[in-house]
Regions:
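Amphipathic, Lys/Arg- and hydrophobic-enriched alpha-helical face
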Residues: 1-19, 36, 112, 161-164
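Short, charged helix-capping/linker segments at alpha-helix termini
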Residues: 9-28, 144, 166-174
């Protein structure tokens, strides 16, 4: 189980970029795994099943945060006299990245966060979690071709976002 705990935590951290939120999601995932173990049909590997639960929990959490921010913004429109800060800029909290690279990594994660949900999921699972495209397709319940397309669009969208920040790198291609 320790292997799966690291897998779940690291995946959640890559999606959420906050240690405390990743820890909460990790707990939620294992509660769901425990409660749903009898429903596991072995049509995929246990790790793929756990990844799918993790990704779904992370996406649900991100959706809830967006709703909360929108609600706070709308509340602020109707009650501007409350001097409350409604949408705090999230701080970057990702271990293992050297200090001098932190700013660049922060821009990258902000750009990843702005991707459409399905592109973000495919990108994180491929480039950060380093899963094979076939497994990503199983996790996302789509075809390998669809995953390839999502990855291409994610890369193009990230390039556009990062070129806004680093215009001097516009002509560089990896």
């Amino acid at each position: 189980m320790e292997t799966y705990k690291r897998l779940v935590f690291n995946t959640a951290l890559n999606f959420l970029q906050h240690r405390e939120e990743a820890e909460d999601i990790t707990q939620e995932v294992f509660i769901e795994v425990y409660q749903s173990l009898s429903k596991f049909k072995e049509q995929s590997t246990i790790s793929t099943w756990i990844y799918r639960i993790t990704v779904n929990k992370c996406l649900d959490h991100l959706r809830a945060k967006k709703r909360q921010k929108r609600f706070g913004f709308l509340t602020g429109l109707f009650h501007p006299e409350s001097g409350e800060v409604l949408a705090e800029i999230s701080h970057f909290d990702h271990p293992g990245i050297e200090m001098e690279k932190k700013e660049k990594a922060q821009f990258l994660f902000k750009a990843i966060e702005a991707l459409p949900e399905n592109q973000k999921t495919a990108f994180i699972l491929w480039h950060i979690e380093e899963l094979p495209q076939k497994e990503i397709a199983e996790i996302m319940q789509s075809s390998v071709k669809a995953v390839e397309s999502l990855l291409q669009r994610a890369k193009a969208n990230l390039r556009k976002e990062l070129e806004k920040i680093y215009p001097e790198r516009r002509n560089e291609r990896n």
